[in-house]
C-alpha cells in the first residue's frame, strides 16, 4: 500500500479526533477499486477502497481531497448513524469544519477507458457491419444466431476485429 496514502488516512482521523474530541476506529484500507470511482467508503465494514490507478495519476489532489472525502463518510456515519445522506449536511460539516476542504461530491480526474475488441459480423445489406462484443461473439461460437433486422439474414463473422 502506498505509504503516503496510509499516512494521509491517519492524519485525517487525527484531525477528526481533535475536532470532535473523541476516538474513531481506524478502517481497513484496500486498493481493490477500478473504473471511474476514485474511492469508496463501506460504512458498515469500516473499509476504505481506493483506485490505485487514479491515485498514481493524480497523487497530490487525491491525497488532499479524495482521502479526506472518503474518511469523512466513515466519520459522519460513526457520529450520526445510518439516517444521514451520503453527501448531506453532516458530511459537508466534516469536509468544511474538520478538513477545511470544499465538499465536492465528484472528482474531475481523467479516466482512461479500457480498449475493447469488437468482432465484426456481416450480412448482405449495404452498411451491413455489426461490431459484436467478446461476450456476444462467444455466444455465437456456442451456437447462438443473430439476424439482421433489415434483411433477416443470419449474421456471419468476417474474421475481422476492431479495437475501440
From Swiss-Prot:
Pfam families: SprT-like
Cellular localization per UniProt: Cytoplasm
GO terms under cellular component: cytoplasm
Annotated SprT-like domain residues: 14-156
Gene Ontology terms describing biological process: response to stress
Domain of life: Bacteria
Binding site for Zn(2+): 69, 73
Listed cofactors: Zn(2+)
Record SMART domains: SprT (SM00731)
Cofactor binding remark: Binds 1 zinc ion.
Keywords in alphabetical order: Cytoplasm, Metal-binding, Zinc
Catalytic residues in the record: 70
Protein family according to the UniProt entry: Belongs to the SprT family.
Stated name of the protein: Protein SprT
Organism name: Pseudomonas putida (strain GB-1)
Amino acid at each position: 500500500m502506498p505509504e503516503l496514502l496510509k499516512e494521509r488516512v491517519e492524519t485525517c482521523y487525527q484531525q477528526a479526533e481533535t475536532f470532535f474530541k473523541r476516538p474513531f476506529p481506524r478502517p481497513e484500507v484496500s486498493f481493490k477499486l477500478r473504473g471511474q470511482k476514485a474511492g469508496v467508503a463501506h460504512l458498515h465494514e469500516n473499509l476504505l477502497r481506493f483506485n490505485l490507478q487514479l491515485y498514481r495519476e493524480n497523487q497530490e489532489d487525491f491525497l488532499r481531497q479524495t482521502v479526506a472525502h472518503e474518511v469523512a463518510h466513515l466519520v459522519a456515519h460513526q457520529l450520526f448513524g445510518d439516517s444521514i445522506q451520503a453527501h448531506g449536511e453532516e458530511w459537508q460539516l466534516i469536509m468544511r469544519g474538520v478538513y477545511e476542504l470544499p465538499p465536492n461530491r465528484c472528482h474531475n480526474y481523467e479516466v482512461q477507458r479500457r480498449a475493447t475488441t469488437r468482432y465484426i459480423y456481416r450480412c448482405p445489406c449495404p452498411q451491413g457491419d455489426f461490431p459484436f462484443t467478446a461476450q456476444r461473439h462467444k455466444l455465437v461460437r456456442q451456437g447462438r444466431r443473430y439476424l439482421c433486422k433489415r434483411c433477416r439474414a443470419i449474421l456471419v463473422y468476417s474474421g475481422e476485429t476492431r479495437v475501440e
